[in-house]
Amino acid sequence: MSAVPDDIAADFIIEAQEILDRLGEQLVSLEHAPEDSEQLNAVFRGFHTLKGGAGFLAINAMVELCHAAEDTLGQARAGQATLQARHFDAAQQSLDYLQSMLDAFGSGSEPPRAPQQLIAQFATSG
């Protein structure tokens, strides 16, 4: 873990946990109503915010996974892609990995990387 002041790390952990908790509910709602642009925007913002905080703290594993989700969601927001069942599956699995990464960061360990197969599931083609 990088030399980050304890209060900044603690604030990130609290905020990231709240975002992860919300994302779980928001993803279920979005999967049931994929045309709901408000819900799509909320899910995009959740991954975007996690990526930004993780980037600031150099949690590269978290940045990589959030970036993959954010790219796919961004394409869907722009009307350039349609979210498929595999995207929702990948997003739900990502929450588990992101939680593991957050737990590792909180305990001072190196966060585990997500499997490349999971990141590849976010691809909008194929």
Predicted regions and their residues:
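Non-catalytic helical tethers at domain boundaries
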Residues: 1-126
